[in-house]
Amino acid sequence: MAKQLLGKEVTAALNERIKANVAELQGKGVNPTLCIIRVGENPSDISYERGATKRCETLGVACEKILLPGDVTQDELLATIDKVNKDDHIHGVLLFRPLPKHLDQAVIENALAPEKDVDCMTDLSMSGVYTGKKIGFPPCTPQACMEILDHYGIDCTGKKAVVIGRSLVVGKPAAMMLVKKNATVTICHTRTVDMPSVAREADIVIVAAGRAGVVGAEYVKEGQTIIDVGINVNAEGKLCGDVDYAAVEPIVDAITPVPGGVGSVTTSVLVGHVVEAAMRKVNG
């Protein structure tokens, strides 16, 4: 039976560090503040907003919301972003995406000030992931994967790692973060030839394929660590990951469950980025 890499244990440790930093900031008269910008009434956005708001409250971080109609114009949204960019008491901004199709998402994303970009929305923030410079912040989900590896003492140095998925949101930044941990990394995608055999060669596999249960027993071997980023709803209406947990768990050494794995850490990473943004501002 594989060891379960439980997100709640990682979150508890991360939250303690965040609380200590919040106390330090408040001692200097600074109240770290997140601003959430939501366009329209997407249920998944509303759900994440609810979770982020609750986590902020728990950790002593202020959370403001700007709720805009689904038919908001490009100019109106850009003006909103410009306003929060100039608001000194707001340290981090989360804009829910994807945006409605009548909006130019790339232009809007890059209008945000990188120092307030707590979920790697801008091109400048993404460049920071690849250069190692503190420009903005890395995406919260791949950062949550790294927090899990760190918390459970899984050393990546010299290990073979496979990332399944090549999105800019998870796959590519996760691969770069693993490289920084001295792993030898392969990125797999829909055009990869014989993906199961490639995945079986790895010591660590991060799965961000975007399809429920796509990674089965043929992808894994004994001794592996599996990080499942996927969040899907199966035919029974239950949450499940991109990994076929029932098939994979008996084989591998360690695995994150869904739910209860990466997703539960991601929200604390977001709040931690807001606090770090405030600390960067205070410390210059």
Regions inferred by a protein language model and the residue ranges of each:
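Positively charged, low-complexity intrinsically disordered leader regions
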Residues: 1-30
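Short beta-strand segments enriched in small/hydrophobic residues
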Residues: 31-40
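Glycine-rich phosphate/diphosphate-binding loop of Rossmann-like nucleotide-binding domains
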Residues: 39-53, 127, 136-225, 234, ...
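Short beta-strand elements in bilobed, periplasmic/extracellular small-molecule ligand-binding domains
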Residues: 56-70, 185-187
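Short, well-structured alpha-helical segments in soluble
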Residues: 76-88
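Anion-binding alpha/beta catalytic cores of soluble intermediary-metabolism enzymes, centered on
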Residues: 92-156
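Short, well-ordered coil/turn residues at beta-beta hairpins
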Residues: 96, 208-209, 229
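Rossmann-fold NAD(P)-binding glycine/threonine-rich loop
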Residues: 106-126, 230-282
